[in-house]
Every structure is written in structure tokens, then in C-alpha cells.
């Protein structure tokens, strides 16, 4: 009887912990306005005519949903020029990662001000923190370059972009349910600036202005509340170069490294192509000669194999962080570049060439393409087969 009562009390305690009320002081109107890029999409007329409180509720609501708290509610109010958030239906410590994000945002704001003082801030840039991410139940960390401006102005969703949408489909191809992919896509951009998608080159000189922000975010997000390391994936050449400059190890595409942003915590990092690189690599206009299309297809198939392997590693490590990173990577490259090359091919032709599934299957069964697939098996024998973008 006593044992049964004790179990019931334990269950009640866990239930209460999962359905607590969290109150958080966000700061002054001025602070919250800049950290939430308010207003997100107003010229003379606002695309969505939201108040500051509604904007904050929107992003905090995204976070609680992506953390898996389906019944959680967010309410934001202003009192004497200070904003406060009340979140119900979340664990008692839920405010801690949110507070850490906003504190890091202050560092980003300072960096942006220095950048502007040096005459390097562009008129069409906006400071944009990774709002709306999974905060408490994140499975892995994605290091990226910068968010496209339309994620802020049109979508008001950090995870709505061609880059993140494509990567989510690759995670799904590796067994992660679509509804759960946001937990794997907690993003840290080394340039916290919403800018036109073509602004990559323009942003190359800004990274050092945000060093305090970048390293703080990596330190805070790369470990769980219990102190365990989360797997990290570094997308694209600028980000992989940043990892080397900041932490030391060289990270090539499908190359593994370990960093220690916190004492005693070893974070596994996998290098990957930028998710959008495949559209450049597979563009026939980038090649010459009568076989330009064939060259583009071959390049695209290689990148698709690399990308599926990287997403496989991310999915596997995120769902079971105790796995050996190198063993997981070997298994993933074997899967997508040796065992399931036909499926790699089909995913390339359906998602990049936009062929119907039946046509993609026929294309991948043709003799010219089958010979190209053998090149995937060759590249799978080498770690870090290419540099990518």
C-alpha cells in the first residue's frame, strides 16, 4: 500500500513539474523591441499589425510548441515600461534557456552597434536572434551562416527558409518524424543578421563583431540542462572556417571534430555542405560542353549523398547522444553512399530536379545514372570527401 502511494505521489510530482507556471521579466520596452526585431515587417503599412506583446507571444509560442508542450500557453504583458512573460504548462526551469538566449542577444546587439559605428552595417539588414527555437528539449545544434530576411519579414519564423525546409526533409528521410524535426534544428547563426539570401559575401567581414555572442550561444546551447553534450553540425565553408578559427580543429565535409566550449564537455562536430549548396553544384549553367547536364547531375548526386549522410549522423546522434560519433558516421555513409544509392538518386531527382517519383525511379535505373552511382560508393570510403560551400 505504501509503495503504491509513493508511486502515485511521484507521478503527481512529475506531472506538476511538467505543468508549472513560469514567470519571466523580459526587460524594458526598449530592450525587448530590439531583441525581438520589432516591428518585424512594417514599412509605412505593417504586413502583420502586431503589438510588441503579440510579437513576443508569437515567438515564445513557437518555442513551447517545438519543445513538445502542446498545451502550453504564453501571455506577455507590459507594466510600467517593463515586459513580463507568463508561460503555463512547461517545466519549472523553462525560463532559464530563454533568459540565456536574451542575455546573449544583448551581446549581439552590442556587436551590431559596433558594426554600425564602423560604417559596415547595411541599410537592408536587421538584427535577428534565433527566436522560436526548441529551448528545453533540443536534440542537436545547427551552426549556420545567417538567416534570410524573409524568415523575419514574411514568415516570422526562424525555421521557415529554403535552407531549413530542405534539411528538415533530409532528417525525415532518416527516420525523424516531420513534427519532431524542429527539435533537431536549434540554430546558431554566426552572423545574427537577417539579410537578403544573396548577402553571404557581404557578411564575411562581420563575424568578429559577434564573437562574444557566438561563443556564448555555443556554450549555452551545446549542452543539456544536465550538462551532457549535444551533437553539432557545421554547415558551409564560412561556418567550418569559423569553427577552426574559434576552436582549432579543421572540419571538412563529412569530417568529424571535437570542441570543448565548456570545461569537461566534449561536443562532437560534423562538417557538412550548406543545405543550399546542392542547387549551385547541380546547376547545369555552371558547366560547359554537350554533357553539362550529365556533369551537373553527377555533382548533384554526390552532394545529395553527402547531405543525406550528414543528416543521418545528426538524426542518429540526436536521438541517442551516447553513440560513438565516428561509428555513427561510418554507418550513415555506408547507408546512403553504398547500400541505398538508388534511394539517394531518387531523392535527388524528386527534390532537386522535381521529377515525379515514377520518373525518378526510371531515371535512376538507367545505365548512365547507375554508372554515376558507383562514384558515390567510391567517395564513401574517404572521410571528408569534399569541401562544398
Task: Give the ranges of each region predicted by the language model.
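Bacterial N-terminal signal peptides that target proteins for export
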Residues: 1-6
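N-terminal signal peptide c-region/cleavage motif recognized by signal peptidases
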Residues: 15-18
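C-terminal capping/extension of enzyme domains
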Residues: 22-81, 202-212, 244-388
Amino acid at each position: 500500500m505504501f509503495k503504491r502511494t509513493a508511486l502515485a505521489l511521484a507521478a503527481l510530482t512529475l506531472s506538476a513539474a511538467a505543468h508549472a507556471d513560469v514567470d519571466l521579466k523580459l526587460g524594458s520596452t526598449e530592450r525587448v523591441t530590439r531583441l525581438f526585431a520589432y516591428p518585424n515587417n512594417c514599412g509605412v503599412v505593417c504586413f502583420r499589425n502586431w503589438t510588441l506583446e503579440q510579437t513576443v507571444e508569437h515567438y515564445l509560442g513557437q518555442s513551447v510548441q517545438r519543445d513538445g508542450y502542446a498545451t502550453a500557453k504564453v501571455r506577455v504583458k507590459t507594466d510600467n515600461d517593463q515586459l513580463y512573460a507568463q508561460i503555463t504548462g512547461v517545466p519549472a526551469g523553462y525560463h532559464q534557456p530563454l533568459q540565456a538566449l536574451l542575455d546573449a542577444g544583448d551581446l549581439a546587439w552590442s556587436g551590431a552597434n559596433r558594426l554600425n559605428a564602423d560604417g559596415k552595417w547595411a541599410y537592408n539588414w536587421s538584427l535577428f536572434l534565433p527566436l522560436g527555437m526548441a529551448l528545453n528539449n533540443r536534440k542537436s545544434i545547427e551552426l549556420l551562416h545567417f538567416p534570410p530576411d524573409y524568415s523575419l519579414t514574411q514568415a516570422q519564423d526562424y525555421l521557415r527558409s529554403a535552407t531549413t525546409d530542405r534539411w528538415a526533409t533530409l532528417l525525415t528521410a532518416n527516420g525523424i518524424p516531420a513534427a519532431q524535426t524542429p527539435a533537431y534544428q536549434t540554430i546558431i547563426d554566426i552572423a545574427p543578421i537577417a539579410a537578403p539570401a544573396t548577402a553571404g559575401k557581404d557578411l564575411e567581414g562581420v563575424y568578429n563583431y559577434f564573437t562574444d555572442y557566438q561563443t556564448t550561444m555555443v556554450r549555452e546551447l551545446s549542452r543539456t540542462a544536465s550538462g551532457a553534450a549535444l551533437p553539432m553540425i557545421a554547415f558551409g565553408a564560412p561556418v567550418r572556417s569559423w569553427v577552426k578559427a574559434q576552436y582549432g580543429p579543421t572540419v571538412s565535409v563529412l569530417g568529424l571534430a571535437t570542441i570543448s566550449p565548456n570545461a569537461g564537455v566534449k561536443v562532437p562536430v560534423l562538417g557538412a555542405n550548406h543545405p543550399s549548396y546542392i542547387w549551385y553544384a547541380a546547376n547545369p549553367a555552371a558547366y560547359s560542353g554537350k554533357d553539362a547536364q550529365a556533369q551537373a547531375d553527377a555533382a548533384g548526386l554526390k552532394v545529395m549523398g553527402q547531405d543525406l549522410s550528414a543528416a543521418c549522423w545528426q538524426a542518429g546522434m540526436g536521438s541517442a547522444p551516447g553513440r560513438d560519433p565516428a561509428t555513427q558516421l561510418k554507418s550513415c555513409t555506408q547507408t546512403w553512399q553504398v547500400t541505398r544509392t538508388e534511394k539517394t538518386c531518387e531523392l535527388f531527382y524528386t527534390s532537386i530536379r522535381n521529377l515525379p517519383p515514377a520518373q525518378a525511379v526510371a531515371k535512376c535505373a538507367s545505365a548512365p545514372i547507375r554508372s554515376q552511382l558507383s562514384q558515390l560508393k567510391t567517395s564513401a570510403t574517404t572521410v571528408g570527401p569534399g569541401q562544398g560551400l
